[in-house]
Structure formats: C-alpha cells, structure tokens
Regions:
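A short, surface-exposed helix-loop junction/capping segment
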Residues: 2-12, 64-67, 146-149, 255-278
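Residue-level detector of anion-binding/catalytic polar loops
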Residues: 34-38, 94, 196, 303
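C-terminal active-site "lid" helix and adjoining low-complexity regulatory extension at the edge
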Residues: 247, 274-291, 297-304, 311-358
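ATP-binding N-terminal substructure of ATP-dependent carboxylate-amine bond-forming enzymes
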Residues: 1-90, 107-110
Length: 358
C-alpha cells in the first residue's frame, strides 16, 4: 500500500478569530516549545478545531477549549449536573441539596418511549414547588441540568419567580431543570491536571462602585468596556435582564445614580464569563481542598478537571463546603485576561497539555 505523506500546515499562524486554546497551541509550536509535535492542521474559517500530529505518528484533536485529554464518557457525564452530584454523593462528597425535574415536553416524550414508559420515577416541573416546600426555603437556584458559563442559572425568591423561570426554560426547550438550595459561602474554581492542583481562585460576582455622579447603567457600561479591553469575552446584553431583576429586589433601577463608594452587586452568579472577578488563592488554599479536587478528578477519570467549590473558609481544613459543579473542559480564557502573571501561568500549563500525544 502506498504511504501517504500527511498534508500538515506547519506554519499556521494564530488569528484573532481562532479559539484561544488553538492560538496558544500555534504560538507554542511556532516558538519551539512543542518539540514532539510534527505539524498542526487548523480549520481556517472559524479556527475552532485542530488536528495535532506527533512525531510518533499519533494524533490529537483539539475542539474549542477542549484540549482532547479526557475520555468522552467522563466528559458527557459531568456535563449533566444531576448525574455528577449523584456520583459525588455516593462517594460521601458534600453537594447542595437539590433535585432534578423534567420540563413537561421532555417528560411526555420519555413517558411515551418504549423503555421509559415503565419508569415510575420520572418527575416533572409541576412537582418542583412541592419539593421546595418540603426540603428547603426560598431563595433557591434553578438551572438547566446541562449547560455552562452560568447560562440560565437563576436565583428565585418566590413561587411566581419559579414558575416564570421554568416557563422560560420550557420555551428554550431545556430538558431538565435542577432546583438547589442557595449557599451563603464564597465560590472557588480549582483546576487539576494529571492529579496536580495547577490553579485556584475565588470568583466574585460582577459589581460596580458608585461615584455619586453616574447612573448605575453608565457604570455598568464602563465596567463592560474595561472587561472587553482586558480581552474578556463578556456578553452583557445576555445578563441585562438578570441585572435589572436583582436591582429591582433592592429598590434600584439602572437609571439611578449610585452613591459615592456604594458597592452594588449586579448578578447572583460569579462565573468569570458573566463578568465575575477572580482572586488568586494558590498561596492560601489549605491542602485539604487540593486533595478533594484531586479526588474528584480521579472519581470521574478526568486528566483535566475544574471543580467549582463553595467553602466557608478555604484556608482551613474543617470548613463547611459544598461542590457546586465539575467541569471537564474548564475554560481559562477569562482568568488569563486578568493579568500578565495569570496569562504566563496558564500558557505554561496549556503547553504541558500538548507536549505529548496522551
């Protein structure tokens, strides 16, 4: 059989519209930091996928911000917040109290299927209010069971808000809603690679500080501009309805002038993709929490693993805690955009991702 020579783009240059992880890959290869990589093919129109060929003849696929290190079944499982928490609880790991409820259209679809028509355990969103009455009190968080970057995560305070949120989920064809207790603890992201804690930071929700001169809306727009200038890809228009709802809870409107030094939290979520601010904690995190993150990465067989952790005091070992989510493709673009030190640290980590075929 004739041996074909691979047609690899050995001199592909980074481009602004390429996925940030692929640009880092290309920069590292061009700089000679990946001596085992023979060549890289990048789909040029969108720059969202890449094929790496190593000198051993092995290949690796990069898909968006997924470096191609984790097993597909593990990645699929942790995309589902309900399944993830089932596994965590079986291992004695604390998670927020909560349960899953199928949206009516999806519940009807399953109940009519050949296999699930015998399942008596299917519960739909008509049962969510009764569950809250029995198990917890408002406010609660309602979120799509599958999703990322905090999209759709809503803090609800009343039965009417619950009904409104679930109705919007139904319109968006969300299949499963997760209802969870609200936690009054700081929120952290811990990143593990091959059993090593390589990054850890506190996530603080998007907020502004008043100057006594400008309206809240003007300050929000200024903050948005600052984030964009930092390279943060923040879609503020998607957050605006949630900002208005949170302000309304405290008797505020976007047109109000924020008092001098008045700090106003704008969102109930702290995701960096929603404008949250990271605070590095690598020097203060207690080893107990690094060990917990490593244990979770092992449970799910994830070489790259992001653990979202609520913890009362991350500097001590016996603090109250709860694991909020596990991520198999924890994007770090937002953290990298916050400073040169963070960029250098994460770039070195990403180079490690690509050094060897597996």
């Amino acid at each position: 059989m004739e041996k074909r020579e691979p047609a690899l783009e050995r001199t592909t240059e980074p481009k602004e519209h390429y996925a940030y992880l692929i640009n880092i890959l290309l920069e590292a290869h061009s700089a000679g930091d990946l001596p085992e990589v023979e060549g890289i093919i990048v789909e040029p129109d969108y720059g969202y996928i890449a094929n790496i060929r190593y000198k051993t003849g092995e290949h690796r696929i990069v898909y968006g911000h997924d470096p191609g290190l984790n097993h597909g079944s593990s990645e699929e499982l942790v995309k589902d917040k309900g399944y993830t928490k089932f596994i965590l609880r079986q291992h004695g790991i604390n998670c927020p109290r909560g349960d899953e409820f199928l949206l009516p259209w999806w519940a009807d679809t399953l109940r009519s299927s050949d296999r699930q028509k015998y399942n008596d355990f299917i519960q739909d969103t008509s049962q969510a209010q009764g569950y809250i009455d029995q198990e917890m009190t408002y406010p609660v968080y309602v979120k799509p069971s599958r999703g990322s970057q905090g999209v759709g995560v809503t803090k609800v305070h009343t039965p009417d808000e619950l009904a409104e949120t679930l109705e919007s989920f139904d319109e968006e064809r969300v299949k499963v809603a997760l209802v969870e207790e609200g936690l009054q603890m700081p929120d952290y992201r811990l990143l593990v690679f091959d059993g090593e804690l390589v990054n850890a930071y506190e996530r603080q929700p998007l907020s502004i500080t008043g100057d006594g001169l400008h309206t809240i809306e003007e300050l929000v727009n200024t903050r948005h501009t600052q984030l964009l200038e930092q390279g943060r890809d923040i879609h503020m228009e998607r957050q605006r309805p949630l900002i208005e709802k949170r302000l309304g809870r405290y008797g505020l409107q976007l047109c109000d002038i924020a008092a001098l030094d008045q700090r106003i939290q704008l969102l109930d979520i702290s995701n960096l993709s929603a404008g949250g601010t990271p605070k590095d904690i690598m020097d203060t995190i207690h080893p107990r929490w690094a060990e917990l993150a490593r244990e979770i990465s092992s449970i799910f067989n994830l070489r790259v693993c992001g653990v979202d952790l609520a913890c009362k005091d991350i500097s001590i070992s016996d603090s109250d805690y709860s694991v909020i989510e596990v991520n198999a493709t924890p994007g770090a673009k937002q953290f990298m955009a916050t400073g040169e030190g963070e960029q250098d640290r994460l770039k070195r980590l990403f180079i490690r991702f690509f050094e060897q075929p597996q």
